Amino acid sequence: DCKILIIEKEQKIGMHGSGRNSGVLHSGIYYPPHTLKAKFCAEGSRLMTNYCKEYKLPILKCGKVILPTKRQDYDQVDLLYERGTINGASVEIISQKELLEIEPEANPAIERALYSPNTSVVDSFAVLNKIQFELINLGVKILFNEEVILANPDQSTVKTNRGSSFKYAHLINCTGQYSDRVSKFFNVGKQYTLLPFKGLYYGLHKNSNIQINGLIYPTPDLSMPFLGVHSVRLVDGSVYFGPTAIPAFGRENYQGLKGVNIKDATSISYHLLRQYAGNKQGFRSYAHQELHKLFKSEFLKSMQKLVPRLSDSNL
């Protein structure tokens, strides 16, 4: 018996989306004003920044520049500036000279860019461990190695793979890549199927002569849910470039064929082919563009639009 119970299918926290991320605290630049995404992103960034400062968790305020890599992208800079300002983010449009003072390795051909000086990076695992510590102290019970495999909404119960059964008053579905499956236990979202994508990164060699001070992003295609390959500076000072956005043929297919099973791979392939054939929101051209980045040479070309001096030997 407990007031709050967390059922965790893994043996420890942060094994999936909560731990497998760059730790960037976005400030609400990308989302249309007055939307929930804009509101939660801006407020969430502020709250997480204060949380890290209060508990002395690692946080790096390194700033972010967003660069237009094509002539038509300059309009996007103005749009993002407008959105960011309305959403309460600290943003400014900077000149070529100002850009190169902030990021000397940035493409010198870029005439103006968007600058978000307050964008920060946190250590995701440090945050998770602190939250876990606080929750346990508050009496929250966490069950590890327990996976919900069945639910009975009429009786307000869930059953796990270990034969345990739990009755609830309120249930929150925060199962990440399995959220669509769990929702269907409750007859919710039956028309939806989650398509997993994964991002691949390259690290910058520590002895490289390329100096990246913060985050360097391209102006994004706002019709897509991805921000394009960019630079990320972590709290320990290491720098990574990525991520790509390629289909994963399993909900935990992080590397090679690990996490792939025939049933999931078949279902995912079917839905991807439907998306490709239907070409909704330009999915087909985007797929071609992203698949090219599986080759290191093509990935490098994308990054060189932002950081021209970057070479194969740096990655």
Locate predicted features.
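Glycine-rich FAD pyrophosphate-binding loop
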Residues: 2-20
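Short loop/edge segments at beta-strand edges and connector loops
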Residues: 8, 61, 95-96, 144-146, ...
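A short small-residue
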Residues: 22-30, 278-283
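Dinucleotide-binding Rossmann-like beta1-alpha1 core, especially the glycine-rich loop
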Residues: 24-98, 102, 111, 229, ...
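Short beta-strand to alpha-helix junction loop
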Residues: 32-43, 67-76, 114-134, 143, ...
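Helical element adjacent to the flavin cofactor pocket in flavoenzyme catalytic cores
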Residues: 113-170, 174-181
